[in-house]
Amino acid sequence: MKWLKNLLSLLEHQLKTNNKIVVLGDFNIAPDDKDVHDPELWKGKVLCSDDERKWLKKILALGFTDSFRLFEQEEGLFSWWDYRAAAYRRKMGLRIDLILISEALKKSCVEGYIDETPRGQEKPSDHTPVLIELN
């Protein structure tokens, strides 16, 4: 949680001088139950704990938006699958890779999606790209 606390502090400072900010990467937090293949199974566990989600909500409360959720998305879209459980093949994923954009960029964001194409490679990552398009 220390990392999230430090990120929150950094973003508070950055927003004082720049209103166009993108924060992206592997947050290791599924923002909501709809970002988890089986919310009951993951309830309270790492990646889905109340504490982790609380810190993410604090960051969002600064004026950031989860860009993926700006657009209507079909259910069951994830960015990470555990190798140990053959989770990709079983559609047992979580959306833990996020692109957060500041309020000033919301109108510029015209698309947000997850590209599962790399998962078809011979030795893929356990994560797949999350992308946005800004105009």
Residue ranges and their predicted role:
Residues 3, 7, 23, 52-55:
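Amphipathic alpha-helical interface surfaces
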Residues 1-18:
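A long, amphipathic alpha-helix that forms part
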Residues 19-33:
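Acidic/histidine-rich, metal-coordinating catalytic segments
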Residues 13, 33-135:
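Metal-dependent phosphoester-hydrolase catalytic domains
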